[in-house]
From Swiss-Prot:
One of its GO terms (molecular function) is signaling receptor binding. Detected at low levels in adult brain. Dorsal portion of the neural tube, dorsal ectoderm, the branchial arches, and the limb buds. Disulfide bonds join 80-91, 131-139, 141-158, 206-220, 208-215, 284-315, 300-310, 314-354, 330-345, 332-342, 337-338. Residues 1-21 form the signal peptide. Its main location: secreted. This is Proto-oncogene Wnt-3. It comes from Mus musculus (Mouse). Glycans are attached at residues 90, 301. GO terms for cellular component: endoplasmic reticulum lumen; extracellular matrix; extracellular region. Some mouse mammary tumors induced by mouse mammary tumor virus (MMTV) contain a provirus integrated into a host cell region which has been named Wnt3. Forms a soluble 1:1 complex with AFM; this prevents oligomerization and is required for prolonged biological activity. The complex with AFM may represent the physiological form in body fluids. Interacts with PORCN. Interacts with WLS. It is found in: Secreted, Extracellular space, Extracellular matrix; Secreted. PANTHER family: PROTO-ONCOGENE WNT-3 (PTHR12027:SF82), WNT RELATED (PTHR12027). Belongs to the Wnt family. The lineage of its organism: Eukaryota, Metazoa, Chordata, Craniata, Vertebrata.
Length: 355
């Protein structure tokens, strides 16, 4: 590991006590192999770090679906890393830390908004899919078909019950967001935006039945989209996220913080928009306080004028170029019937990395 990254990682781990208060550390269950066996070992619920009492009760009462919750968080993290692969902050996780993103999400930034939304959506998505696959006895297919069949088709197959997946995500992910402060309000809003995206993207999927491929009978069912579509949509919402300001009100239970759109001339955010109220660091240099790993040694696109281009990704520091040899299949030929034969070629590529 490079010295500057080693120093940053040590700084993040040593500051762990402060970091843990920033966001749900139960997300770390996505990185633990032992949690895939939760369904057969209920006592593991007590070993999940960061669970509030309501989440612990949920885990023990609905132990069958907890592996899907873990899978959903993992799915959200993987999608975050895909969506931000060419950005200065690329959704880096720290495997041996309970705060898997480091201090980055301590602040109420756009990045925090996106991660909460995609993780919440991931839980809803994975639970819904697991129910449709029949891996749990407490859920299954959606028997409420949401309307009569259309002309030329009838209901069939297993409609995915996204309402149940959303309910699980809401009950579990929002359980800790019960404080009367601005950060809880922001987290709950963005969690719900992620879940709403799942519901909005449900679509009819159909299959034809008949002799010789004819479509004498067509059956349809409700299905979730590929999770990449959810990530793409929420990434667009990240780019257009609404900046908010914090307002304090005195109520019977004491002071309560709420969020209001910062710019009155703009359209206020809807339940489908992401919200934030603190500016992001520039992520150019390593910084243990902000959790930035910097962009040194990151691969950049020399032909791009976007954020993944060497000018922006490298923050004006310039870039290095090296050549790389790669073995690839080439000159492939299809043979009847039925296989493909290929030769192996050595190709030379230029690789550009930030200084």
């Amino acid at each position: 590991m490079e010295p500057h990254l080693l120093g940053l990682l040590l700084g993040l781990l040593l500051s762990g006590t402060r970091v843990l208060a920033g966001y749900p550390i139960w997300w770390s269950l996505a990185l633990g192999q032992q949690y895939t066996s939760l369904a057969s070992q209920p006592l593991l619920c007590g070993s999940i770090p960061g669970l509030v009492p309501k989440q612990l009760r949920f885990c023990r009462n609905y132990i069958e679906i907890m592996p899907s919750v873990a899978e959903g968080v993992k799915l959200g993290i993987q999608e975050c890393q895909h969506q931000f692969r060419g950005r200065r902050w690329n959704c880096t996780t720290i495997d041996d830390s309970l705060a898997i993103f480091g201090p980055v999400l301590d602040k109420a930034t756009r990045e925090s908004a996106f991660v909460h939304a995609i993780a919440s959506a991931g839980v809803a998505f994975a639970v819904t899919r697991s129910c449709a696959e029949g891996t749990s006895t407490i859920c299954g297919c959606d028997s409420h078909h949401k309307g009569p069949p259309g002309e030329g088709w009838k209901w069939g197959g297993c409609s995915e019950d996204a309402d149940f997946g959303v309910l699980v995500s809401r009950e579990f992910a929002d359980a800790r967001e019960n404080r009367p402060d601005a950060r809880s309000a922001m987290n709950k809003h963005n969690n719900e935006a992620g879940r709403t995206t799942i519901l909005d993207h449900m679509h009819l999927k159909c299959k034809c039945h008949g002799l010789s491929g004819s479509c004498e009978v067509k059956t349809c069912w409700w299905a979730q989209p590929d999770f990449r579509a959810i990530g793409d949509f929420l990434k667009d919402k990240y780019d257009s996220a609404s900046e908010m300001v914090v307002e304090k009100h005195r109520e019977s239970r004491g002071w309560v913080e709420t969020l209001r759109a910062k710019y009155a001339l703009f359209k206020p955010p809807t339940e489908r928009d992401l919200v934030y109220y603190e500016n992001s660091p520039n992520f150019c240099e390593p910084n243990p306080e902000t959790g930035s790993f910097g962009t040194r040694d990151r691969t950049c696109n020399v032909t791009s004028h976007g954020i993944d281009g060497c000018d922006l990704l490298c923050c004006g520091r310039g870039h290095n170029t090296r050549t790389e040899k790669r073995k690839e299949k080439c000159h492939c030929v299809f043979h009847w019937c039925c296989y493909v034969s290929c030769q192996e070629c050595i190709r030379i590529y230029d690789v550009h990395t930030c200084k």
